[in-house]
Amino acid sequence: MRRFLMTHLLVGLLTALLVSPAFAQQTRITWWGHSNCSKDLVAEWNKKNPNTPVQYDFFAMTPYFQKLTAALSTRSAADMFTLIDFLLPGFTAKNVLAPIRPEWLGYKDLEDMKKAYIPGALDGYIHKGKLYALPPIASGFSLFINTKHFREAGLDPDKDYPRTWEDVGRIGKKLVKMRGSRMVREGFDFAMHSSTWTMWYFNTTIRQYGGEILDASGKKCLANSEAGVKAMNVRARIAHHYKASDPTVSLGTNALPADDLPKGRVSMFITHAGSVAQFGPKVMKYVKVVPFPQVDPKKPVTPIYGFALAVNPHISEAKQRAVHKVLKHVVNDSKTWYERTSYPHPDKNFLNLPGMEDARKTRYLDVFVKDISNGRFLQRSDKVLELNQAIHRAMERVVLKKEDSKKSLDRACKEIDAALAKK
Amino acid sequence: MRRKTMLRLGGALITLFALFGVWVMLLPYFWMVSSSIKTGIEVFDLPIKWIPDDIQWVNYPNALAKGAFGVYFYNSFVVAFAVMGGNLVFCTLAGYGLAKFRFPHRELCFRLILSTLMLPLEIVLVPTFLVVRDLGLVNTYGGLIAPLAVDAFGVFLMRQSIRDIPDSLIEAARMDGCSEFGIFWRIILPNCKPALGALALLAFRDNWDQFLWPFIVATTDNLKTFPLGLAQMEGIDSAAYHEIMALAVMGMIPAAFIFLFFQRAFVRGITLTGLKE
Amino acid sequence: MGREIGVDRTLPSKIRRLVAGGGKRSLHSHLRWAGFFFVLPALIHLIIFKFYPMLQAFRLSFYRYDLMSPPVFTGLENYNLLWQNPLFHQSFWVSVKYMFGVSIPEWFFALALALLLNRRMPGRSVIRLAYFFPIAMSQIVVAMVWKFMYHPYGLVNTILETFGIGRINWLSMEESALPALIAIGIWRGIPLFGVIYLAGLQAIPKEYHEAAIIDGAGVFQRFFYVTIPLLLPTITFVMVLSLLSAVKVFLNPLVMTEGGPNGTTKVLPYFIYETGFAFFRMGEAAAASMVLFVFLFGLTLIQLRLLRRGGVE
């Protein structure tokens, strides 16, 4: 055993010495991402472009942004990397992203480029009139309902599905199943596992009531306004007035927030288009997707988010140009992305691409794309994560401890204002 | 006579208690193994079915095929063994120096070493990364290994254990004209085997499982370690928990073997503490 | 009886003499520095990879630094911001609760486990391996598995229900979330420190126990007058290290509760990580770390002093 240890030690040290000098390639482009799908696109690219090969490295989601930050701060990041939309302001404020050049992608300018996309779909990536990341996917949230449970409760899933939040509470109540005093099936529930999800719901509802989280300058919290209190009451009412959900149940759910739906533990749940692929065709047979609930269905607002590709500003212009060619290759293959991930592409003509008819019928593509086109990105702020957490805590106090919405939001606004005051 | 039966009864009770404890300790582990042979949908089914109707051994090869796991395992072995080696050598030397010599500022030295345990890695991450970068070690085995090669944990453990060794032994060897290093080699090492075993085991385990540091330092696939491979299974496209669990089971095997191997270090010279009345 | 009293009095002092390191006048003066050379390699390593980064972190605590733009000197502002931030205060106390909640049970249970595994019993090596398994489990897997165990419909509740206790939604109530995480910490810590105690027990020379048996000492007398005094260095180690390792927990709350509900599981390392890498305020994170550092350093010195007074040195 000792010899075994020693040999391995030696092999390790020797390899360490041999591998040390980093590969100094001519025009190798590096890309950090978090999706397996990109791997195949890269392989395809490398076959066609042996002179500018792309080296794709895949990282797990949660710590990925930490690695990215550490790398950007030490100027050792990849040439291009994936970002989630709401982190963009944090990065653009610090000038660590290179602007995307529409002219290198074959558009006349940014306005021309916007016309090729679903209206508003690029807004989340624009800062001071410049585009900083290119989305290969767009996602919104829609309401998923279990049609079996609907029929059991004597409801018609095609007609009786909820349009407004009050509908959600009213219908949700009918879908609840109790055993003694304990709820064994929730009629509806919000995901509670993540402050970002909380903010997607809350930010959207406050906008449905005509409010905003921050004022126009982005320096003052407005979440405790009348609209904010109403938006918070939506959650409180569904839990406490209608008793359509047991909010303590969903916090502890596993890593897949939407998993309670295919397990039959909840009858209605709000989730993203990617869930269609996660649930699989067997579950989707009895799950129907309907539009995101509204305050007033005539003035719809929904949440939208996306992952997008950004360019490292520390590389030469020639290399940036080469990176743009790769970007173009990646975003042009919207159909592959869709088939692999179920996330639609924000392309205006996406629905009319050949081969989409089937998906429109069976995978609720129309519903998703419609919700996305009513979509608005999360409040832009370089303090967005602090905003999310303050609102999440406020929501927990209201929903779990039955604190008054106004009082709870006042405290959240105090926390948010303190965060915004910091440089 | 009565005392003897009492003792025997007590012994049996303790054994029973130990066996009960084993089940409590192992429950999560059973779940892990059971999940690794289910289909993805069954994993989170409740109530739990410990043995699925249709055992999915195929999860294991499928999971391994999802990444360059041969490379990841190899890298983890290299890093874990190298760091373990570094710790065994340097921590034992330092522990001996601190335990058995009185040099000026010894206590200060010890406290300084101990103080390195008191800052979370997150906070020294960027400065440490800068050191590694300036040494040209980013994305190399050296960068993965060097910053971890000495841990104050090990220095402290060895200092405490070497203190137990009677000074008379050292004195006697010194009288016989043994060199200082000779004393270390012939007297100290053989007498602190149990602690060395514990250190080796824990160093191996910790570094087999090391996540954050390799994650920051390794940027290409050929340098990723096993936990990085495990974590990247949890991509947004697919959360394949059955396969993650299959990998997790395989990831435990090396540590279990190392434990069995080093266990002898603890077991040797058994055992008076309990029985033998 | 008289012989037993004799054991009680003489054995500890003999042991004390044997255990007491240093203070040997017979050491030649040239040996004074020999010890330093044994320490030197480790010290050099730590200076490069630990002290230097620590000093950098200390310096950063007086700067405003977002990791991407150059740092700006702001004096004590970061400390002032922390002092005024109720969330920092909350995190600090969560960490203190977690630290003692995990480590104090560990001190006793780990020793009990080591004594247990040091006995002769059927299938001992299998039992030892079984107890060791929780530490062989990868941290990220621990978090994933336990999250599922604590699920409202999960294993823990299934077991409780068979005893007629209703469902408890462990991770979503302020009262139970932290205790639930503490239980995981203990579960994982006991085998770890058990292994160290086991090593310490094995290092006790047989002769002491044999001598004590010849002198007629019973099981408990041997435990208190032989095992405990000889194990004191190991006990010191476990007491100090269990606190230091408990306070660093971070992955479990991150994966299982995101610090919630309402911040009740946001331990200080999580706060630090988040302030630095999510909120991009590295200076403030560094300042928070310095507070943690001073607290832990003070605590450790007190522990070492108390344990020394307890008779080791």
Please name every model-derived segment.
Chain B
Residues 4-5, 10-277:
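A structural signal for multi-pass alpha-helical bundles of membrane permease subunits
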